[in-house]
Amino acid sequence: MVQSAVLGFPRIGPNRELKKATEGYWNGKITVDELFKVGKDLRTQNWKLQKEAGVDIIPSNDFSFYDQVLDLSLLFNVIPDRYTKYDLSPIDTLFAMGRGLQRKATETEKAVDVTALEMVKWFDSNYHYVRPTFSKTTQFKLNGQKPVDEFLEAKELGIHTRPVLLGPVSYLFLGKADKDSLDLEPLSLLEQLLPLYTEILSKLASAGATEVQIDEPVLVLDLPANAQAAIKKAYTYFGEQSNLPKITLATYFGTVVPNLDAIKGLPVAALHVDFVRAPEQFDEVVAAIGNKQTLSVGIVDGRNIWKNDFKKSSAIVNKAIEKLGADRVVVATSSSLLHTPVDLNNETKLDAEIKGFFSFATQKLDEVVVITKNVSGQDVAAALEANAKSVESRGKSKFIHDAAVKARVASIDEKMSTRAAPFEQRLPEQQKVFNLPLFPTTTIGSFPQTKDIRINRNKFNKGTISAEEYEKFINSEIEKVIRFQEEIGLDVLVHGEPERNDMVQYFGEQINGYAFTVNGWVQSYGSRYVRPPIIVGDLSRPKAMSVKESVYAQSITSKPVKGMLTGPITCLRWSFPRDDVDQKTQAMQLALALRDEVNDLEAAGIKVIQVDEPALREGLPLREGTERSAYYTWAAEAFRVATSGVANKTQIHSHFCYSDLDPNHIKALDADVVSIEFSKKDDANYIAEFKNYPNHIGLGLFDIHSPRIPSKDEFIAKISTILKSYPAEKFWVNPDCGLKTRGWEETRLSLTHMVEAAKYFREQYKN
């Protein structure tokens, strides 16, 4: 009989209960026991929801207070020495590794000052994981038994679950060697790590687990030979052990075909494959399945919010049943549902027609179950009919098509994506306008979003204050930020973005073709959640979006103020995109909307315009090849279409987060100045790659995701390291990213120390 399965469910709670609890704990407002109770309540709620929906195979150990990869590092004792010396509790160690910790000594606790581990994008999603850091002194051992405890927790509720673990090869491959052990190959630690996996799996079996889901998402990457060999070695090893639960080897986000040789013949009970992202792999995967293995068909999209087409999905599952038999097929989500909002029923303000196009995590449970029942011959005719009508109505919807937008995209030519002169000719004109010192200082855009800002925005949205009152409040906040920047001596200022709720949502709300949720939160990292806008139809800008605030900010200072925009690729990648139009087309529509805004800012007297692209690397296809090179070409073109309509003397900036970007790809954007998140890299080789980069650059100097405050000496040391490989005359001094999530006191001190460090180097380079 065909079974239904879910690979993971959002951990945040329908009303962001996890965020409120973790931040409450960090701020000392709740105890650790109260935090743990919230976690237990959320897990219970998720398991019961899936059970009541009729899901056969329900995941456990998909919950985390911060990040599932970080949980594994704590479980296996992959904890760098800088954390262990403080004798923190396990949960405080977890949080210190994720976000850093800086606290003064008290009567009961000693002082702590430790930076966070590196945070990296989870494949091509907008989720971030905390990267495991290995050294030659890493000693694997079990710290607790979280997967077992959560399995038993569900068992007490009468719910039999399938525990989820990130696999050993993916865990090692996605990690890195510590800076003191750079010659260490993480995969060389596999033999030491496998016994710990076996120990956890044995404990799970003893607790009553009959099956486990082991995720090896690296199987959709271009794996080197040693990683493919590691897959064979790891799962052959598991197959040689006795009394372990059956293993479902799970992959997602792409095709496994290039790595099928590593998968064939493995002693695993089932293979899960993502047929949403890579339906073309079906025949080769089915041919590679062993005679007794089950195929888990990932057919309900774990990454996007569009309603499933039951007819198409059922056809794919039936094809698998024809090849393998019903007992060897599972209907599943393509990946964990972590990447989707929790429940569409919480959306009360969406247009009814548009709402009918969507399916959030809770609704996706029903989709998995309906498809399973349909292919099993059960009567779901009413559900199939309603689904078919919904799918058809979306294709005909008035919200989808705009002929004028399509015509404008078709008219894009090379001239529209080329600045009037090359950088070496633009630079002297810009220097004449700005007369900036060596080591110019700036920030990336946002300043702290205080409680007062959120309260007033909420009042305005509810209509309890007028537009005039709200504008007056926003202007007062802008003035505070401008005066602060002048006071500490920053060179190129920002207005602080107090009017913006989110860097994509703010613009999306002013662009035709977008839809927005009230409660469609998705975890980005830790307690940082986002509400991705939804691209429903063709995109266009009806009027100026940011000019008013930028003009006001520039009017109250003699220093240059940057106009701040979010780039076309980031607007695309940090939205739920359409699935009926290719992403290049959507990017070009956004580029044209932003081009109009850039030109309006310049016409209004804004001389520095920053178009942020923190998601540029995220959009890259996971595998090398023509798709990847094509992506870089059209992504760079979209940026240039947005920014190339300005005069030579107008300075274009851009910014990238979490990005291992090739300098040549950044060069293709032709921005005058770029800033890159860098504070947690400590990578001299990466700096050296930019030695011959022709334009100006700022490598981020402090981690804005951590409350920790770097000293002036730390800034000096970091800049000194950079200047060994990068020319001083091209270097800008800036933080990693925007300061929206930080408090004012830590912002004030960190930026003051940063400016003091820049002034120190100006003295050093005077002659």
Curated annotation (Swiss-Prot):
In-chain residues carrying the UniProt-annotated modification Phosphoserine: 89, 242, 629, 706
Active site: 705
Record InterPro entries: Cbl-indep_Met_Synth_N (IPR013215), Cobalamin-indep_Met_synthase (IPR006276), Met_Synth_C/arc (IPR002629), UROD/MetE-like_sf (IPR038071)
Binding site for 5-methyltetrahydropteroyltri-L-glutamate: 19, 126, 502, 525, 528-529, 574
Cofactor dependence: Zn(2+)
GO biological process, one term: methionine biosynthetic process
EC number(s) on file: 2.1.1.14
Keyword Phosphoprotein (UniProt): yes
One GO location term (cellular component): cytoplasm
Any matching Pfam family: Meth_synt_2
GO molecular function, one term: zinc ion binding
Pathway it works in: Amino-acid biosynthesis; L-methionine biosynthesis via de novo pathway; L-methionine from L-homocysteine (MetE route): step 1/1
Sites where the protein binds Zn(2+): 655, 657, 677, 737
Superkingdom in the source lineage: Eukaryota
Modified residues (Phosphothreonine): 566
UniProt binding sites for L-methionine: 444-446, 497, 612
Record has Aminoacyl-tRNA synthetase as a keyword: no
Miscellaneous comment text of the record: Present with 264000 molecules/cell in log phase SD medium.
Function statement: Catalyzes the transfer of a methyl group from 5-methyltetrahydrofolate to homocysteine resulting in methionine formation.
Record-linked HAMAP family: Meth_synth
Name of the protein in question: 5-methyltetrahydropteroyltriglutamate--homocysteine methyltransferase
Organism: Saccharomyces cerevisiae (strain ATCC 204508 / S288c)
Encoding gene (name): MET6
